[in-house]
Amino acid sequence: MRAVVDTNVFISGLMLPHSTPGKVIAAWREGHYQLILSEPMLSEIGAVLNYPKIRKRLAWNDLTISRSLTLLRFEAEITDIQGTQAHVPRDSKDNMVLATLLASEADCLVTGDLDLLTLAELHPICTPTEFLLRIF
């Protein structure tokens, strides 16, 4: 299975490894699915990892963040979303996430974002709990 994992799930999973988002990240690390990201999503993950509150919670420094982003570049499938039209009516900042799903033709977008979840009737979008039920 190929899945786009939204930034909110990814960061939550790093911060709370025993939570449902943490289990989504663990399932990727264990090879249960292929993680799909795009360059804009990688940039967003990097920006969020650099928030002082997140850095403190994870106890990560610049080197740890840099290494983690490099690992993501090599381990995730990076999809080019240029030219992909995506529109999230309630939050245009989510357009890049939906564009990643559409451009990659992934099996699922895993998110906790209500603006994206409202589009689940039109696209393969699910919550972390629903995703875990699908892969296990």
Set out the residue ranges of the language-model regions.
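Short, flexible helix/strand-to-coil boundary loops that buttress conserved ligand/catalytic motifs
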Residues: 14-15, 49, 120
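Residues at secondary-structure transition points
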Residues: 19, 36, 60-63, 88, ...
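Active-site neighborhoods of divalent-metal-dependent phosphate/nucleic-acid chemistry enzymes
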Residues: 73-108
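Short, well-structured N-terminal submotif of metal-dependent ribonuclease cores
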Residues: 1-37
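Nucleotide phosphate-binding site architecture
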Residues: 11, 43, 55, 117, ...
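Alpha-helix N-cap/helix-start capping motif
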Residues: 8, 39, 62, 113-114, ...
